[in-house]
Amino acid sequence: MKRIVFCDFDGTITVKETFVAVLKHFAPQLSAQLIPQMYARELTLREGVRRILESIPSSRYPEVLEFTRCETIRPGFTELLDFLEAQKVPLVVISGGLRGMVEVVLGELIPRIHALHAVDIDTSGEYFQVNSEFEGGTELVAKVQVMEKYLVDEKIAIGDSLTDLNMALETPIVFARDRLAQYLEEHQKPYIPWQDFLEVRDYLAKLWNLVSNDE
């Protein structure tokens, strides 16, 4: 059976909501206005995030990357990668945030990621210009569109917030925490609660019958 794991980045791989912190830090007034509207689903992520990003001067891009450099990765992520590699199951990172931020935080783990899909930024003008290969619907990175690229028998999603909702609704096996868990409860969509990636690894090991029932 061919399997694949799709994993969000901000607030999922990272302990904190890295991208939201960047928006609030580099565009505080617009973020204070638009982020609550996005969480309340009164404004789409596609429109709100674009407006905030394109208000940030291009000259500040190095500061954005430096701001995220020391973000903490959630415990167990490396162990999950070890487990998935042993099972020959690829992990794909799908982030609604900036590609550069993801690459800075993951660092030496990047070669172990099967693929990374995120928002690209053009800094050749005065302000950020957003480019996204998978922009569509309500999202700058339409995660369901990304998932459709991968033809496998079993898809697993891991996430934590609003940017993961559409992905979670379209995936049979979902690990959800924080805001995503709340949204899924509203939609009456079953999910597996989790706090760290060791829990994800151990659940998948049991699901795939890789450990005995009495362990």
Residue ranges and their predicted role:
Residues 46-82, 87:
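Metal-dependent phosphoesterase signature
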Residues 30-36, 61-64, 112-113:
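Short, surface-exposed acidic
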Residues 1-54:
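Active-site neighborhood of HAD-like aspartate-dependent phosphohydrolases
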Residues 21, 66-68, 133-134:
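Short, contiguous strand/loop micro-motifs
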Residues 25, 70-71, 93, 171:
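Residue-level marker of alpha-helix boundaries and capping positions
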Residues 76-90, 97-215:
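C-terminal cap/substrate-recognition subdomain and adjoining C-terminal extension
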Residues 1-5, 9, 53-64, 158-175:
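Long, low-complexity, intrinsically disordered polar/charged segments
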